[in-house]
């Protein structure tokens, strides 16, 4: 058979294999191509720059943040500030380590573990915001914060372990390039399922105020909470669409998930800061999760008397006697400026016969003697 093929001047082609999107493409080259002759990848540099800038911003705001934290009794703000700080540090560490590792198998595993650690912290903050906002936002106590963090830690750890196991033990061959296995977020199928799940969760949060459920439970009234949920719902929707295209072996989907991955791992921590911490570290700290609109109390009615009546009352006091006038003057200088009108009226009442302020008080002295 082989001789027949050689005689015909042709060779036997191997059977067609499944379409692999690891063929050179701009969206794929971005993930693993190095800058010049260095081992620094464009992808790692793109993720490093926003995290470094945000970390510098946090350091710049650190003196003000420490001063605000000292005078606050809310553990929610302290917890969120620490978590945002940690996420920025982990993002920087992941990018720096990825820049220094080689293309060996051990280095690839280390890089994927750093990706999972970063994802773990980001997901923990995601779940903490949702749980605190919907269930425990009105309980700003250390015990409630610890319970929320414990729940989010367990859930985030389970998610990250599952994703890491799929990524390391069962890497997606469609997300590999040359001799370097690119981090694939657990594979196309896992990426699609998780993106759809989080899209449904955040979409439900956004529409909650429009449902009859708002009459039965207390929902956050801050607009920034729902803007935060809406942004993440949109991000997960785009990520799900990109993953679906990858499952259909359409390489354009890789460009979509590249964009969503960059936005999530670079700007999620700043999103948390702007949505929930900027008001706290501003000039006037605001409540993180408010559950009803604050109604200002009605202004106190002006207790001071009209000017004509006040003049007439003053003349009556002066005619009543010097002692009573002295008491009125004392009242005016001590209390009028402070707005305590009730004490002013008592002290400036006309003096009656037999009162302590009248001239008949001499008989009280005789009795006491």
Curated annotation (Swiss-Prot):
GO terms for molecular function: G protein-coupled receptor activity. This is Transmembrane protein adipocyte-associated 1. It is found in: Membrane. The chain crosses the membrane at residues 45-65, 73-93, 120-140, 148-168, 189-209, 237-257, 262-282. The lineage of its organism: Eukaryota, Metazoa, Chordata, Craniata, Vertebrata. The keyword Cell inner membrane does not apply. The keyword Kinase does not apply. It is a multi-pass membrane protein.
